[in-house]
């Protein structure tokens, strides 16, 4: 987000005391010089960490990092909406065809970055 620096934007606060002797009119309580907006981005998945290798799913897994194959490491989502690295999950399903988190039968919903 861009910084807001359009001169002096003023904000007048109303008195919380409710007394009749409070200041009114054009008296400024403070002047806002600069404002840095901050935003958060959220995924549509329950967890953003691969439960098998404990690395964030949008980063390459440990094996792909060690073999320098970061671009080949993609994310796989199950019908249970849990996400893992595809290479981690492909090894997992050879031993156990269930989701490591919820133990439902593993069915691939989609694969991609």
From Swiss-Prot:
A zinc finger (RING-type) spans 61-103. It catalyses: S-ubiquitinyl-[E2 ubiquitin-conjugating enzyme]-L-cysteine + [acceptor protein]-L-lysine = [E2 ubiquitin-conjugating enzyme]-L-cysteine + N(6)-ubiquitinyl-[acceptor protein]-L-lysine; S-[NEDD8-protein]-yl-[E2 NEDD8-conjugating enzyme]-L-cysteine + [cullin]-L-lysine = [E2 NEDD8-conjugating enzyme]-L-cysteine + N(6)-[NEDD8-protein]-yl-[cullin]-L-lysine. Pathway: Protein modification; protein ubiquitination; Protein modification; protein neddylation. The keyword Metal-binding applies. Pfam families: zf-rbx1. Induction: By 1,10-phenanthroline. It is found in: Cytoplasm; Nucleus. Zn(2+) 2 binds at residues 80, 82, 99, 102. One of its GO terms (biological process) is reelin-mediated signaling pathway. Its EC number is 2.3.2.27, 2.3.2.32. Expressed in heart, liver, skeletal muscle and pancreas. At very low levels expressed in brain, placenta and lung. Belongs to the RING-box family. This is RING-box protein 2. The lineage of its organism: Eukaryota, Metazoa, Chordata, Craniata, Vertebrata.
